[in-house]
């Protein structure tokens, strides 16, 4: 009954706003961010036991390991994101929304939505592991990293990237870092264009019959999807 109701709402809507979060990926088996599974153990290698890591987020935000060890895990995780299969949840959603007027806002950083939807229909609110930025940041630019990720993964030694190979900013020489939300997350020109495209879609359809479809959204960062969706559902006429 719930599935039939969802199909009915999708068919009746003039516009569909999808808010996709980590539950979308977890439902497809991508749980290494939060769990100690085989994927995480491959990413961490010997560092799992050396530092007592339990999952990728635990390792990513840890402060006690070397920079080379830190980068080894980032590189392996990002390489996995490039090589892994497309999640079934994303394939199913693409089928449901085929031919519909929709837009997707996501807090996911794993680029799974880009496997099944066009980039101009997606805004990644919390960044994307496929890009790097200056860690300062000294300038407003993000960099695609696929070629470097695959090259550097082959140069990891004993679960650490040699210090001399750590990616550096081409302008100031500081370390690069993944373009994902953190203390130095770059919300520059690229990010603003992404957000404005999303906000323009909302503005254009604020008086139309709009379906807000919240998928896999928890309470870790409710300010990005859950709370705005609740406010718009309450305020918009249809």
Feature map (PLM): residue ranges:
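Conserved catalytic alpha/beta core of Sir2/sirtuin-type deacylases, generalized to analogous enzyme cores
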Residues: 1-238
């Amino acid at each position: 009954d719930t599935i039939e109701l969802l199909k009915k709402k999708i068919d009746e809507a003039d516009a569909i706003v999808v808010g996709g979060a980590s539950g979308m990926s977890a439902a497809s088996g991508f749980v290494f961010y939060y769990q100690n599974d085989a994927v995480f153990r491959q990413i961490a290698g010997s560092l799992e036991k050396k530092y007592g890591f339990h999952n990728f987020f635990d390792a990513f935000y840890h402060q006690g390991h070397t920079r080379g060890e830190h980068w080894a895990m980032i590189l392996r995780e990002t390489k996995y994101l490039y090589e892994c299969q497309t999640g079934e949840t994303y394939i199913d959603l693409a089928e449901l929304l085929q031919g519909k007027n929709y837009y997707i806002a996501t807090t996911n950083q794993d680029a799974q939505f880009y496997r099944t939807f066009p980039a101009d229909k997606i805004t990644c609110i919390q960044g994307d592991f496929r890009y790097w930025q200056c860690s300062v940041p000294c300038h407003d630019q993000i960099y695609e990293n696929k070629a470097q990720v695959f090259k550097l993964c082959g140069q990891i030694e004993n679960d650490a990237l040699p210090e001399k190979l750590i990616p550096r900013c081409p302008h100031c020489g500081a370390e690069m870092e993944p373009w994902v939300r953190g203390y130095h997350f770059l919300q520059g020109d690229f990010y603003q264009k992404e957000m404005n495209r999303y906000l323009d879609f909302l503005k254009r359809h604020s008086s139309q019959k709009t379906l807000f479809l919240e998928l896999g959204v928890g309470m870790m960062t409710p300010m990005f999807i859950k709370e705005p969706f609740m406010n718009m559902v309450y305020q918009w006429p249809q």
